[in-house]
């Protein structure tokens, strides 16, 4: 945009009235103006394109289904036998998303592994998964069914996977010097995230919870005895920088929510 400014010519020489023309009295000057719309400078940090796109989702659903459905517990312990997961008919993620669609939601997140560690897909990382369940459970692959249904309804989809895992003997494990080992991150958590990423590069969110053990008892590899474990720094324990890069290489548009992610609680949660 440009503006035009009229400058009055200052005549210092004596002249008789009326001898100067209007052309000599005024001069038209063309100037370029920086920031003509007065756009404010950004106040850092500013959201990334990935975050802005994620924010457009606005209204979407969380679907909680898993081992706790059959134990009637809010949180499991990782000590549940796999055969307790025993659906008598095929779970129907399509029906879940159909209801969300009717509510004018734009997408959904399926909880495919909660703190008890039971995986709702036949993962290669643990025996604590649908592969070893009973009833129709042996045929369950919730991530696949959920992703297929989301594409059918043209909805966004993603997965919740708990970093905390009360079924894994590696979680919170320490070496002989009392230092946490990296076995869980390398052998379990990162491989599980990579497995989920392979269900579709059109995922919009991977949701990590921030729970870090503490007062809740877990089996940590045992079906019969429980113990308490915790970790001191989730960022380093889960190798978050490597995790973030690895997932973004597979899913360029996915937002990682929670531990070390790009979206988080707004600060008022209890």
Where are these regions (language model features)?
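Mature catalytic domains of secreted/periplasmic carbohydrate-active enzymes
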Residues: 23-270
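Bacterial Sec-dependent N-terminal signal peptides
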Residues: 1-25
């Amino acid at each position: 945009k440009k503006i035009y400014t009229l400058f009055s010519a200052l005549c210092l020489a004596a002249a008789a009235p009326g001898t100067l023309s209007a052309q000599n009295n005024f001069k038209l000057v063309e100037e370029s103006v920086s920031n003509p719309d007065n756009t404010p400078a950004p106040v850092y940090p500013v959201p990334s394109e990935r975050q802005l796109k994620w924010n457009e989702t606005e209204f979407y659903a969380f679907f909680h289904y898993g081992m706790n459905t059959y134990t009637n517990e809010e949180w499991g312990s990782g000590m549940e036998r796999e055969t307790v997961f025993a659906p008598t008919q095929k779970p129907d993620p399509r029906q879940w998303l159909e209801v969300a669609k009717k509510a004018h939601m734009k997408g959904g997140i399926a909880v495919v592994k909660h703190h008890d560690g039971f995986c709702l897909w036949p993962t290669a990382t643990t025996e604590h998964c649908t592969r070893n369940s009973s009833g129709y459970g042996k045929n369950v692959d919730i991530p696949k069914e959920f992703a297929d249904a989301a594409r059918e309804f043209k909805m966004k989809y993603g997965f919740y996977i708990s970093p905390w895992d009360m079924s894994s003997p590696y979680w919170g494990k320490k070496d002989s010097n009392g230092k946490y080992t990296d076995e869980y991150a390398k052998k379990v958590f990162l491989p599980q995230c990579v497995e989920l990423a392979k269900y579709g590069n059109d995922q919009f969110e991977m949701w990590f919870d921030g729970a870090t053990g503490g007062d809740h008892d877990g089996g940590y590899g045992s079906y019969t005895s429980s113990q308490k474990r915790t970790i001191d720094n989730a960022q380093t324990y889960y190798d978050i920088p490597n995790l973030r890069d690895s997932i973004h290489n597979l899913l360029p548009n996915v937002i990682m929510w929670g531990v070390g992610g790009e979206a988080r609680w707004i600060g008022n949660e209890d």
